[in-house]
Amino acid sequence: VPKSGRTWFRVMLSKYLSLHFGEQLDIGGYDETSTVLPNILYSHEIWSHRMTSSVRRRLLGFYICPESALLDKPVMVVHRDPRDVLVSLYFHARKRSRRLFQGSIAELVRDKERGAAAMVAVMNAWRERLSGKSDVLWIAYAELHSRPEALLTAAVALLGLDPNPEFVHQAIDFSRFDNMRKLENQGGLGKGFLSPRNAADPESFKVRSGVVGGYGKHLAAEDLIYIDRVLQDLDPFFGYSVSVERDSSPS
């Protein structure tokens, strides 16, 4: 599901790999010509498949990873409290998306394509799809705040590398919110997806807020009641079943 912290983790892991291999930082991801860095495909996969307006791409499964590759390769899944995701997605849909959303946040929460129910469907699909697979790392956005060292170390080990604690520390420091915002202001490391839509509007930045549990500032009580009802269908593995307004200050 988008807005779950993938870009943050992507920068963190990419920085580690650049240090580990002594290569220039590249957050682009998959590159068939690379002979040094591990080839990592960053994708929203099922979500992109559901959201594409191209009937041809949907029929061809353009965004879907073949099952053979999925079973053969290590997988990392970044997930986040759907309530926080919905708030972040709303600002993205209003400020950054090529298909700008014209409705209210309450309408987005209930939207069939990208609302709460769609998120639950995608998250459940991934849990079922990866059931029984041993080389999977589930990365909770909140834990990227609370224990980034442990998660990045686990990710590096999953890639078959011997983690270097100093490089882990440097990569985490590099990917902190303030530096990510500065990088975005400076051109997003040459990548359009890490560039602000409008530099004068903080809500249009890819790195917008970076907090855990801030959804209460934007979602009305009736929205939270609706989301809670939808989350009853979410696999309890994720732990997002009850509305608890958490500390909204960055870690």
What are these regions (language model features)?
Residues V1-I139, R208-S251:
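PAPS-dependent sulfotransferase catalytic domain
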